[in-house]
């Protein structure tokens, strides 16, 4: 087992394949607004497909809160190309006199926020009921703050190297789970350093 930081770096340098081909994905949320800057009360446009089943364009908390989801990509260029294609399709098919709100904090919102509707199937009803619970618990305004989520995963070969580096008997999914949990613990501990 590598005891110190320099030994660990040397160990990883001997296995460059374990630090290549990261998986990346983006989930981007944005509000549909009217010309007057108020939240749209219109239903999810049919040109975007079903909010329940479409893999790339769905709704989040509110019917007007769009979410764009990229598949896992191995390169940043591939990731941005896909996200650009989603944006292009959405903008071309926006209903008349609607725009995408560019900021995370919501536009002017009246008291009523139409919850996302996913149809009459059991899973669709469950998703809408879940959002009703969020609305009751936290209020609508907190739920329509939009943002960008960057998803990141290490390649399977990394976890084999990680287990070897730590003399761990864990393999496969067990090694991944232990590694990601350790990463999260250390992020919470040292995350304040990142901005500096």
Where are these regions (language model features)?
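Extended, regular secondary-structure scaffolds
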Residues: 153-196
